[in-house]
């Protein structure tokens, strides 16, 4: 199994390190043809409007959207969640629209308002230390979306078929369980 990490912008190196810690072959993806070399893709946190703009410039946007619709597994964290969402409610921007959620950008505050919180994740025996940095908030989601974790009654980890998204940054912890969850999605 080879997992891609979108290297367009953002904290892709941290995801790469986390996946390598799990013994996974990792490829940093920056071109559309590189999607054909991987079995799944992680889209990191960063600046979502910049990511979309660059993805379109290098012709990655449309190919990725099509592959996801065909069942290609993808995991988006923070800005990655925004990119994958159906709609961004507080800022006019494009998104891939591959998971039926509506998000509000930077809903948990600015960079200085970043925080950590122990959250319960469906299927995990112990809580997960979630790190929120200018995190998006899910304000609505469709009936086919599974909520795997919440913070203050708001969904922060969700899945719809082959798409997994998190408001927080699991790659900034030492806990590999959410990345392992994604790898299990890819294996199926």
UniProtKB/Swiss-Prot annotation:
GO BP of this protein: glutamine catabolic process; pyridoxal phosphate biosynthetic process; pyridoxine metabolic process
Alphabetically ordered keywords of this record: Glutamine amidotransferase, Hydrolase, Lyase, Pyridoxal phosphate
Pathway, per record: Cofactor biosynthesis; pyridoxal 5'-phosphate biosynthesis
Annotated Pfam families: SNO
Keyword Protein biosynthesis: no
EC number: 4.3.3.6, 3.5.1.2
Binding site for L-glutamine: 46-48, 105, 133-134
Reaction equation(s) it catalyzes: aldehydo-D-ribose 5-phosphate + D-glyceraldehyde 3-phosphate + L-glutamine = pyridoxal 5'-phosphate + L-glutamate + phosphate + 3 H2O + H(+); L-glutamine + H2O = L-glutamate + NH4(+)
Oligomeric form and interacting partners: In the presence of PdxS, forms a dodecamer of heterodimers. Only shows activity in the heterodimer.
HAMAP family xref list: PdxT
Protein name: Pyridoxal 5'-phosphate synthase subunit PdxT
UniProt source species: Thermosipho africanus (strain TCF52B)
């Amino acid at each position: 199994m080879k997992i891609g990490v979108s290297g367009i912008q953002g904290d892709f190196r941290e995801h790469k390190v986390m996946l390598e810690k799990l013994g996974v072959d990792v490829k940093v993806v920056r071109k559309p043809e590189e999607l054909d070399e991987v079995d799944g893709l992680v889209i990191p946190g960063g600046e979502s409007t910049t990511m979309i703009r660059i993805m379109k410039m290098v012709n990655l946007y449309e190919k990725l959207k099509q592959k996801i619709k065909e069942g290609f597994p993808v995991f988006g964290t923070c800005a990655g969640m925004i990119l994958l969402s159906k709609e961004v409610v507080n800022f006019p921007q494009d998104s891939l629209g591959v998971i039926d959620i509506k998000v509000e950008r930077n809903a948990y505050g600015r960079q200085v308002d970043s925080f950590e919180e122990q959250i319960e994740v469906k299927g995990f025996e112990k809580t997960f230390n979630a790190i929120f940095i200018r995190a998006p908030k899910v304000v609505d989601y469709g009936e086919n979306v599974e909520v795997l974790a919440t913070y203050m009654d708001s969904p922060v980890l969700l899945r719809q078929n082959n798409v997994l998204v998190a408001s927080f940054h699991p790659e900034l912890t030492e806990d590999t369980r959410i990345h392992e969850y994604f790898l299990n999605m890819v294996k199926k």
